From Swiss-Prot:
Family statement: Belongs to the peptidase C1 family.
Subcellular location(s) of the protein: Endosome; Lysosome; Cytoplasm, Perinuclear region; Golgi apparatus
Gene that this polypeptide is encoded by: Cts7
Protein name as catalogued: Cathepsin 7
GO MF terms, alphabetically ordered: cysteine-type peptidase activity; peptidase activity
Record-linked InterPro entries: Papain-like_cys_pep_sf, Pept_cys_AS, Pept_his_AS, Peptidase_C1A, Peptidase_C1A_C, Peptidase_C1A_papain-like, Prot_inhib_I29
Domain of life, source organism: Eukaryota
Class in the EC hierarchy, top level: hydrolase
Main location: other
Active site: 136, 274, 298
UniProt source species: Mus musculus (Mouse)
Length: 331
């Protein structure tokens, strides 16, 4: 595995002069700024416009060259359109996810349905938005615990990502600069609790720890790492509920994802940099057509992907590392 540790924030100022804008894109640029609530200083607008135009051209070229109509996979210009590649990586590529051997509680011969969506069973809270803070690891872990809390109590309570960010630093996490789900689960287990979003709301920046035990709404007794193969992941998902996973999310095609079954030829299974929640699986078309997918909840808001979710190839040799770093808690 190639480790990816911590990246420095890219300064907004760029030394090189921005190229002259393509005035044919003026109306599209103004509409994009309006719909994404962007305002800039005059100098910054030149730089951001240049980046945005480059991304527009890349998306058009990528669609033309790669035939993204396959499996209905599409990309689009979204809220990340004025960000450089390095800036987009800041949202994901903040910590390496070391591969771990796993073991999990497994029922004998669990019945595997042809499709599964834990959202329909009430296990999944609404999609949230991490913003410019690289806290995907915390969103993935809290969402996973939320599902187990619902399974145990029947109550679906959004948990505090901010609590996890602020208070798990001594376990190796870095707030908005990244963290590992294993360390986050370890904190919640040892801490004896985690607050709800309602009492410890998300602020998209790390602060000092303000956890109060009397406001805790959940405890984690232990947690399990799933063996690194898709069959074990499938069994764990069916048996236990939503699973915290990590994938290679470093590519522009990921940040520009709109819908369909994701396809990225450069996606790796041993370089993991983005945490998500695995909530189900299914297939497009007929089951015999081998267009199977995993269904994942992201933390980029509902305007990204399929209302905040994405489909990743299933049964394709651990595509993008979907089964390389999966875990879930027991309450």
């Amino acid at each position: 595995m190639t480790p990816t540790v911590f990246l420095s924030i890219l300064c907004l100022g760029v030394a090189l002069a921005a190229p002259a804008p393509d005035y044919n894109l003026d109306a599209e640029w103004e509409e994009w700024k309006r719909s994404n609530d962007r305002t800039y200083s005059p100098e910054e607008e030149k730089q951001r416009r240049a980046v945005w135009e480059g991304n527009v051209k890349w998306i058009k070229q990528h669609i033309m060259e790669n035939g993204l109509w396959m499996n209905n996979f599409t990309i689009e210009m979204n809220e990340f359109g004025d960000m450089t590649g390095e800036e987009m990586k800041m949202l994901t590529e903040s910590s390496s996810y070391p591969l771990r051997n796993g073991k999990h509680i497994q029922k004998r011969n669990p019945k595997i349905p042809p499709t599964l969506d834990w959202r329909k069973e009430g296990y999944v809270t609404p999609v949230r938005r991490q913003g410019s803070c690289g806290a995907c690891w915390a969103f993935s872990v809290t969402a996973c615990i939320e599902g187990q809390l619902f399974k145990k109590t029947g109550k679906l309570i959004p948990l505090s990502v901010q609590n996890l960010m602020d208070c798990s630093v001594s376990y190796g996490t870095k707030g908005c600069d990244g963290g590992r789900p294993y360390d986050a689960f370890q904190y919640v287990k040892n801490n004896g609790g985690l607050e709800a979003e309602a009492t410890y709301p998300y602020e998209a920046k790390a602060k000092h720890c303000r956890y109060r035990p009397e406001r805790s709404v959940v405890k984690v007794n232990r947690f399990f790492v799933v063996p690194r193969n898709e069959e074990a992941l499938l069994q764990a998902l069916v048996t236990h509920g939503p699973i915290a996973v990590a994938i290679d999310g470093s590519h522009a095609s990921f940040h520009s994802y709109r819908g369909g079954i994701y396809h990225e030829p450069k996606c790796r299974k041993d370089t993991l940099d983005h945490g998500l929640l695995l909530v189900g699986y299914g297939y497009e078309g007929h089951e015999s057509e081998n267009r199977k997918y995993w269904l994942l909840k992201n933390s980029h808001g509902e305007r990204w992907g399929e209302n905040g979710y994405m489909k990743l190839p299933r049964g394709q040799n651990n595509y993008c590392g979907i089964a390389s770093y999966a875990m879930y808690p027991a309450l």
